[in-house]
Curated annotation (Swiss-Prot):
MF GO annotations: adenosylmethionine decarboxylase activity
Recorded superkingdom: Bacteria
Active site as annotated: 126 (schiff-base intermediate with substrate), 131 (proton acceptor), 154 (proton donor)
Keyword terms: Autocatalytic cleavage, Decarboxylase, Lyase, Polyamine biosynthesis, Pyruvate, S-adenosyl-L-methionine, Schiff base, Spermidine biosynthesis, Zymogen
Lineage: Bacteria, Bacillati, Bacillota, Clostridia, Peptostreptococcales
Organism: Alkaliphilus metalliredigens (strain QYMF)
GO CC annotations, alphabetized: cytosol
Disordered: annotated span: 96-115
Protein's UniProt name: S-adenosylmethionine decarboxylase proenzyme
Length: 278
């Protein structure tokens, strides 16, 4: 479905649209022994601690042209971390969102921040949050790490331009992405706009070199301004999923069994349902 292109239209008051990006990544691992599972959880917990997550979210704010107002961060015991940022937009004249902030193309990596004008308003409904969830299966050696990132903005800022950077920031076997636009804004003649930028697919905001690594499917509800994409890695190399052991140290039977376990785990996560064992 093609959505009409938006010309720059002068708005009445501020842009009141709320745009929300939900980004969920999964890293899957197999550890042969319980102590190796514990070591993986400790490793991944340290890799994505609150300090590093704060840097990632700061770059998200930078890419979207937002101004950070406050930061709250916390590491949890025994594992996990969370960071919440309150951000404000940096724009001058209230118009429909500039192409550079929402154009249907991959967003920049850190260092290419859109040029802001003077700050005219603090929008307290704009925020960025991340939570991490390391966990391990009690019996079969499978461990997973999940990170949930939510970027909700009110005004010109669109979080979708940060998507390309977020995918680069995490080692992701599976990625689930949701984007939605809510509310409406008016032009100076009183006409409502329920979305202020072109979008046909979330995939158009992801660089081709990244997309080529994944199988990706879309489920979009255009009339409701709801867009959904999920991706799973194409290339399966067992050594990339082993922690504390290499494939060369395993018997052929062990390798085959672990591959089956990992593929089942990834399939269940990707489709969001348990696989029936035959």
């Amino acid at each position: 479905m093609d959505i009409k292109s938006f010309e720059k239209i002068q708005l009445y008051g501020f842009n009141n649209l709320t745009k929300t990006l939900s980004f969920n990544i999964y890293d899957i691992c197999y550890a042969k022994a319980p102590e190796q599972s514990k070591a993986y959880i400790a490793y991944i917990d340290e890799q994505y601690n609150a300090e590093r997550l704060t840097k990632i979210l700061s770059n998200v704010a930078d890419i979207t042209g937002a101004n950070i107002l406050s930061i709250s961060k916390q590491d949890y015991d025994p594992q996990g971390a969370s960071v919440t940022m309150l951000v404000a937009e940096e724009m001058t004249v209230p118009t429909l969102t500039p192409e550079s902030l929402t154009g249907e193309s991959p967003g920049p990596l850190p260092g290419n921040k859109p040029s802001p004008g003077s700050i005219v308003t603090h929008l307290d409904k704009s925020h960025v949050t991340v939570h991490t969830y390391p966990e391990t299966h009690p019996l079969d050696g499978i461990s997973t790490f999940r990170a949930d990132i939510d970027v909700s903005t009110c005004g010109h800022i669109s979080p979708i331009k940060a998507l390309n950077y977020l995918i680069h920031s995490f080692e992701s076997d599976i990625v689930t992405i949701d984007y939605r636009v809510r509310g409406f804004t008016r032009d100076i003649n009183g006409q409502k706009y329920f979305i202020d930028h072109d979008i046909n697919s979330i995939q158009n905001y992801i660089a081709k070199d990244i997309l080529n690594l994944y199988h990706a499917i879309d489920v979009n509800v255009y009339q409701e301004n709801i867009f959904h994409t999920k991706m799973t890695l194409k290339d399966f190399k067992l050594n990339n999923y082993l922690f504390g052991v290499s494939e060369e140290e395993l018997s052929d039977h062990e390798s085959a069994s672990i591959k089956d376990q990992l593929r089942d785990e990834m399939q269940e996560i990707f489709y969001g349902r348990n696989v029936t064992k035959v």
